[in-house]
């Protein structure tokens, strides 16, 4: 199936954002992260109008929903690109944007350092010798599942 990928791009946080569209022939079981990698792997990346384009800047670490690096807005919703598959999206036009609550580094990459700085400020961790009840352990386990991707802040 042929998809149109509409990407909100930006050179850096001071630059003005712009939209660029690409086309890709892909199967539904391809993830957004894998699709971006396929676009960037092209010998010569051209947009939908045939104009040569810079590679799309995005972060993809684990590709299996473990690190949160690939968080972005996909069709307006905060999602992980590695676990969002073409077949799960409606339509043949896919809109990709950086998360809106963080400064843009470039294209789909954002600076989430404010999250980590705030966690340091509030000392949100347990000392190694802290006693935990079973209830506390369960809460700690649930919070440890957070990827710190920033999707929940959208």
Predicted regions and their residues:
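Signature of N-terminal electron-transfer/Fe-S-associated modules in redox systems
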Residues: 1-154
């Amino acid at each position: 199936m042929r998809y149109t990928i509409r990407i909100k791009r930006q050179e850096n946080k001071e630059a003005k954002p712009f939209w660029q569209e690409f086309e890709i022939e892909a199967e539904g079981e391809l993830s957004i992260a894998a699709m971006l990698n396929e676009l960037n792997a092209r010998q010569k990346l051209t947009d939908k109008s045939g104009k040569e384009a810079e590679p799309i800047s995005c972060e993809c670490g684990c590709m299996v929903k473990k690190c949160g690096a690939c968080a972005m807005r996909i069709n307006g919703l905060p999602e992980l690109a590695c676990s969002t598959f073409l077949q799960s999206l409606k339509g043949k036009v896919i809109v990709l944007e950086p998360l809106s609550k963080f400064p843009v580094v470039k294209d789909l990459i954002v600076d989430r350092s404010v999250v980590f700085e705030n966690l340091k400020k509030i000392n949100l961790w347990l000392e190694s010798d802290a006693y935990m009840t079973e209830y506390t352990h369960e809460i700690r386990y649930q919070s440890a599942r957070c990827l710190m991707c920033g999707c929940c802040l959208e």
